[in-house]
Swiss-Prot record:
Gene: mutM
Key words of the record: DNA damage, DNA repair, DNA-binding, Glycosidase, Hydrolase, Lyase, Metal-binding, Multifunctional enzyme, Zinc, Zinc-finger
Catalytic activity reported: Hydrolysis of DNA containing ring-opened 7-methylguanine residues, releasing 2,6-diamino-4-hydroxy-5-(N-methyl)formamidopyrimidine; 2'-deoxyribonucleotide-(2'-deoxyribose 5'-phosphate)-2'-deoxyribonucleotide-DNA = a 3'-end 2'-deoxyribonucleotide-(2,3-dehydro-2,3-deoxyribose 5'-phosphate)-DNA + a 5'-end 5'-phospho-2'-deoxyribonucleoside-DNA + H(+)
InterPro entries reported in the protein's UniProt record: DNA_glyclase/AP_lyase_DNA-bd, Formamido-pyr_DNA_Glyclase, FPG_cat, MutM-like_N-ter, Ribosomal_uS13-like_H2TH, Znf_DNA_glyclase/AP_lyase, Znf_FPG/IleRS
Cofactor detail note: Binds 1 zinc ion per subunit.
PROSITE patterns tied to this protein: FPG_CAT (PS51068), ZF_FPG_2 (PS51066)
Gene Ontology molecular function: 8-oxo-7,8-dihydroguanine DNA N-glycosylase activity; class I DNA-(apurinic or apyrimidinic site) endonuclease activity; damaged DNA binding; zinc ion binding
Protein name per Swiss-Prot or TrEMBL: Formamidopyrimidine-DNA glycosylase
Description of how the protein assembles with itself and partners: Monomer.
Length: 281
């Protein structure tokens, strides 16, 4: 599932084609997604001006002038495709079948923006003006925002008897983090993913906040990580997977200079965790 860097990369790719533009035409081609499309989706979107395109956690929100917002989640395999004269020659990935094009928009410049989702776990929904979608109501601070501080994270960890990795994946504590980037940040911070969150010291929390930010910023700069389905809105792959230090590297030597450890994989709450048992305490 796309994590924060992948979603932010897609948002940035969509921004020139949606923000400030009018949706001249909209089609809902398959309403029976696992999260059904709103019956008035086409009516609300047609003629709407997108005044801002932002991200909250792993969601993309297109704020519409006087019409609320369009909320998008990519699910497991969702992709946003951009096609049109302004993009030059566009070659559709043969693995992306047109029958999985569920929502198609055309902006006032003729550019086509398509939500394609083979596994149909994605979501397209409408948020009424002045309302907040229930899925966004209880999210924690954005990890790249000023609200994500060592003090705030230490307060959230205080007294928690859950593994620190599980705490970081709790969207109520910090929004948008996922398995890949939590594993990478914990490695850089030298914290064992099995440590109880409440036992992480204040200096360790401060270091962890810095490493979370750094990993996310580096991943966004690389276009995210393309392990399976992720593509940027232009169709390009992300490249941060080539910079993984521990994620997916079970059995490889620890990359820390001078360390003789080997990257190990364990399962926590049904998810793989990768770490060096010598470097991470």
């Amino acid at each position: 599932m796309p994590e924060l860097p992948e979603v932010e990369t897609v948002r940035r790719g969509l921004q020139p084609h949606l923000e400030g533009r009018v949706i001249a035409r909209a089609e809902a081609r398959r309403p029976d997604l696992r999260w059904p499309l709103p019956p008035d989706l086409v009516q609300v979107l047609t003629g709407a001006r997108v005044v801002a395109l932002r991200r909250r956690s792993k969601y993309i929100l297109a704020e519409l002038e006087d019409r609320g917002s369009l909320l998008l989640h990519l699910g497991m395999s969702g992709r946003m495709l951009i096609e049109g004269e302004s993009q030059g020659d566009f070659h559709r990935d043969p693995a992306i079948l047109p029958r999985h094009d569920h929502v198609v928009l055309w902006n006032d410049q003729g550019t086509r923006i398509t939500f394609n989702d083979a596994r149909r776990f994605g979501m397209v929904d409408l948020v009424p003006p002045g309302a907040e979608h229930p899925l966004l109501a209880h999210l924690g601070p954005e990890p790249l925002s000023d609200a994500f501080t060592a003090e705030a994270l230490a307060a959230a960890f205080a007294g928690r008897r859950m593994p620190v990795k599980a705490a970081l994946l709790d969207q109520r504590i910090v929004a948008g983090l996922g398995n890949i980037y939590v594993s990478e940040a914990l490695y850089r911070a030298g914290i064992d993913p099995r440590r109880l969150a409440g036992a992480v010291t204040a200096p360790e929390v401060a270091a962890l906040v810095g490493h979370v930010r750094a990993v996310l910023e580096e991943a966004i700069a690389a276009g995210g990580s393309s392990l399976r389905d992720h593509r940027q809105a232009t169709g390009e792959l992300g490249y941060f997977q080539h910079s993984f230090r521990v994620y997916g590297r079970e059995g490889a030597p620890c990359p820390t200079p001078g360390c003789t450890g080997t990257v190990q994989r364990i399962v926590q709450s049904g998810r793989s965790s990768f770490f060096c048992p010598l470097c991470q305490q």
